[in-house]
């Protein structure tokens, strides 16, 4: 099951799936999506958290990941397992391990969050990624297009209790808006807090 970032909140409101995969090259959006999943997990009683980071796939202990879901502590009823693969390349052993991991999912006391960078077409068609897709929810974070930035920023300001004058038109001539594919989401997000001249508090 694949969803977009702006669909995540509504999805989480209906309940959690056992596996979430967040991937893409927009650091802020990926972080926010992961934070939203973590918050929903905490609210659902997933009180223990284990994090695995794959530095070198060839030297990573994949058996530790496979065993983690079966190693609940005496004091934690439910646990969140996070797997981070910065390279997006688990290797052959990792590919096999991820597919076995997905096959073993099903326990209500374990929720898994996998974080990946941007993946190319071949990676998205791989056996391990297909297994993640079949076992849970795939969330791809995409760059915000330049033409969409004014509305995107206005929406974020509204979430802070602020709004843009003239329905967002005040942002259109903003010279510091980055181009679509080259910039991350971080600069305009930080700038949201400095646009005091173009916004006003919602009464």
Protein language model regions, located:
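Conserved beta/loop motifs at nucleotide-recognition and modification sites
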Residues: 1-203
